[in-house]
């Protein structure tokens, strides 16, 4: 008995002593100087401990394996940490204050009076913060390769380091192979750590100051204020400027250093909360440790938590990722086939897309191939990553895609007469529909049940909720509607309460998902929600009632009459569904095809070619792009008569129009109405698309 009690007591003690370890943040450090600073932090704040590794790569491995929890990395290392074999994500960004917030400038610096510019760097000696780092390597070398100053055919020809060695006379690029020309100017072991005196921003500047190198690739703040007058910036146009002119003379503006960790929301919150709670210790000072930028950059002023869905790609942005890929030659080429990769959402769309691919085969290849994703947002991410090329989306999704750097290139036209003689921009009416005789009006919607095409979609959410927000100035729409179905909402939200799912009795993983398997998703889905009495009002497009009634609809709608429904007008009256031009919530832009700016030409030319063959009056009747058999509105809206090219250079704001942009800006005052993807795409001021 005593033995049992002793065992139990020891077990309790072990649990008691082990418990605090769960709350400890294990910080990974790369040098003895960082280790000293980390130990001083841990002495002040018991929730921190320190793990010493030789470099960033070893820290990334340690974090993946759970030996460490976090480290602050620059953009180049954030890219590496986010690769599939490591799977880490940025969770917290450094903020450098009003001038640059969560971004910083990458610049080229030389001593004043030296007679060369950025266009005449060949044969000079160079100082780099480190191999693969943003300001010190990726940006300057990427720029020199892009401008054809450094001649490099690609990794299959030779490593980029070899091309850089041929370009510069000698260099110090910590992390390069010891004994190579890239280590020739280094003062220590050429390691990518503070063991090398010329490592990092301060080290690269010291390399220049000591006369070892002619040019240093750093950030402006690396030049001490007292020494600015002795140095100049090298501008990309070949001119020079003062150090303080970095806003107009720089190589690029890049995302800030960020804390990375494993993909664990609870761990991310714990790390952030522990860091912001630190008192009596300056995280952003390296004074007294004989090195700079230890654990964090000394120029950081605060830390900002990132949206939970932010991954390395979204954090770094498409432009910076393209620069990194250009140095690794890992970007998708695909120029030889000219096939476009269409993104399909859900099984039904993938099935139609596969049929489109098969019918498009000619001369041994197809003009279309298919990628699939669970949601439109995931498709947008795939297009950004070059895993897909195009998708047709609603105006609200055009808005989000535009914020992420994509562009609208073709628009659905619903009037056949305008296909041959385009005039006014293609559009449709967003309407509110109720059952006739319900007594419901626009003025009496509060407390009722609502049916939406999807969260963030134009007719189904942005327009009606934007109008309601303008009336109430309240962002909590659950106070306005009692419940409803808005696919894409958080599970457990009142806006998921009325969703139907795929019809499975148990374990329905598609319930409330923004995809075709959710039977109340999209225009016809929202109308079905109203028909089956899951809601009192449906927010849809003006053509949906006539397309789904009077014998025109699917089986569930075969006995419906259009006269059994009515439109709710904003003035509190009701009208027959045929009076949409007089009774609507807004006239909005049609659905559009989105892609990356650089693939615009291919997407437009291939779609025009395929439309001539498979369009409404195409030459090949074996497949029709604008018809859906299994479900409605697959890939394109079934009411589409043709696709029309949007003039080159049209920004998403111009396509959506002033009224729609005003409605979106009003709705975006409600943070809950902004998707995590949009938040991630607009987090950095240097990544935002005007």
Curated annotation (Swiss-Prot):
Database matches in Pfam families: Transferrin (PF00405)
Q: Is Disulfide bond included in the keywords of this UniProt record?
A: yes
| Classification via SMART domains | TR_FER
User: Quick one: which residues bind hydrogencarbonate 1?
Assistant: 129, 134, 136-137
Keyword Nucleus, does the record have it? no
Q: What keywords tag this UniProt record? A: Disulfide bond, Glycoprotein, Ion transport, Iron, Iron transport, Metal-binding, Repeat, Secreted, Signal, Transport
Q: Which residues form the signal peptide?
A: 1-18
Which cysteines are cross-linked by disulfides? Answer: 28-50, 127-207, 172-186, 235-249, 343-379, 353-370, 404-681, 419-642, 451-529, 475-670, 485-499, 496-512, 569-583
Chain's role = Transferrins are iron binding transport proteins which can bind two Fe(3+) ions in association with the binding of an anion, usually bicarbonate. It is responsible for the transport of iron from sites of absorption and heme degradation to those of storage and utilization. Serum transferrin may also have a further role in stimulating cell proliferation.
Protein name per UniProt: Serotransferrin-1
Name of encoding gene = tf1
């Amino acid at each position: 008995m005593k033995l049992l009690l002793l065992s139990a007591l020891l077990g309790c003690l072990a649990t008691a002593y082990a418990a605090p370890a769960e709350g400890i943040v294990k910080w990974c450090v790369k040098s003895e100087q960082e280790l000293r600073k980390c130990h001083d932090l841990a002495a002040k704040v018991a929730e921190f401990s320190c793990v010493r590794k030789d470099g960033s790569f070893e820290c990334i491995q340690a974090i993946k394996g759970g030996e460490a929890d976090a480290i602050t990395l620059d953009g180049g290392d954030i890219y590496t940490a986010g690769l599939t074999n490591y799977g880490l994500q940025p969770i917290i960004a450094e903020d450098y204050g009003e001038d640059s917030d969560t971004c910083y400038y990458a610049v080229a610096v030389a001593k004043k009076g030296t007679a060369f510019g950025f266009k005449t760097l060949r044969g000079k000696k160079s100082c780099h913060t480190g191999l693969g780092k943003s300001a010190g390597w990726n940006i300057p070398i990427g720029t020199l390769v892009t401008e054809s100053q450094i001649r490099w055919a690609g990794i299959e020809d030779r490593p980029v380091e070899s091309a850089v060695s041929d370009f510069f006379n000698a260099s110090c690029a910590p992390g390069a192979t010891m004994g190579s020309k890239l280590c020739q100017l280094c003062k220590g072991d050429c390691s990518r750590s503070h063991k090398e005196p010329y490592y990092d921003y301060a080290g690269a500047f010291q390399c220049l100051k000591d006369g070892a190198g002619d040019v240093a690739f750093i950030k402006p703040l690396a030049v001490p204020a007292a020494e600015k007058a002795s140095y100049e910036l090298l501008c990309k146009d070949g001119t020079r400027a003062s150090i303080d002119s970095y806003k107009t003379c720089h190589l690029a503006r890049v995302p800030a250093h960020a804390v990375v960790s494993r993909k664990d929301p609870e761990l991310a919150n714990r790390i952030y909360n522990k860091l912001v709670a630190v008192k009596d210790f300056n995280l952003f000072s390296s004074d007294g440790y004989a090195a700079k930028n230890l654990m964090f950059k000394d120029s950081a002023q605060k830390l900002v938590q990132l949206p939970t869905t932010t991954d390395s790609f979204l954090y770094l942005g498409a432009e910076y990722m393209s620069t990194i890929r250009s140095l690794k030659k890992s970007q998708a080429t695909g120029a030889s086939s000219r096939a476009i990769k269409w993104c399909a959402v859900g099984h039904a769309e993938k099935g139609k897309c596969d049929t489109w691919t098969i019918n498009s085969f000619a001369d041994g290849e197809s003009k279309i191939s298919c990628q699939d994703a669970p949601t439109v947002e995931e498709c947008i991410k795939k297009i950004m990553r070059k895993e897909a090329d195009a998708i047709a989306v609603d105006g609200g999704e055009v808005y989000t895609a535009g914020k992420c750097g994509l562009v609208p290139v073709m628009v659905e036209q619903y009037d056949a007469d305008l296909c041959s003689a385009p005039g006014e921009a293609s559009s449709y009416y967003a309407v509110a529909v109720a059952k006739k005789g319900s007594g419901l009006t626009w003025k009496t919607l509060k407390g009722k049940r609502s049916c939406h095409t999807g969260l963030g979609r134009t007719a189904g959410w942005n327009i009606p909720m934007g109008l309601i927000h303008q009336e109430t100035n309240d962002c909590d729409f659950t106070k306005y509607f009692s419940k409803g179905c808005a696919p894409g909402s958080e599970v457990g939200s009142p806006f998921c309460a009325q969703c139907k799912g795929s019809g499975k009795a148990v374990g329905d993983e598609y319930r409330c998902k923004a995809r075709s398997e959710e039977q109340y998703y999209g225009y016809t889905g929202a109308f079905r929600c109203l028909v089956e009495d899951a809601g009192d009002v449906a927010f849809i497009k003006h053509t949906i009632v006539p397309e789904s009634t009077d014998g025109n609809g699917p089986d569930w709608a075969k006995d419906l009459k259009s006269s059994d429904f009515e439109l709710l007008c904003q003035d509190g009256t009701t009208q027959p569904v045929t009076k949409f031009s007089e009774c609507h919530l807004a006239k909005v832009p049609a659905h559009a095809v989105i892609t990356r700016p650089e693939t615009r030409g291919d997407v437009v030319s291939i779609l025009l070619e395929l439309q001539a063959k498979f369009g409404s009056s195409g030459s090949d009747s074996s497949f029709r792009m604008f018809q859906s058999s299994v479900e409605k509105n697959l890939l394109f809206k079934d009411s589409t008569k043709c696709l029309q090219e949007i003039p080159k250079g049209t920004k998403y704001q111009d396509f959506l129009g002033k009224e729609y942009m005003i409605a979106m800006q009003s709705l975006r005052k409600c943070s809950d109405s902004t998707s995590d993807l949009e938040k991630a795409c607009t987090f950095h001021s240097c990544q935002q698309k005007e």
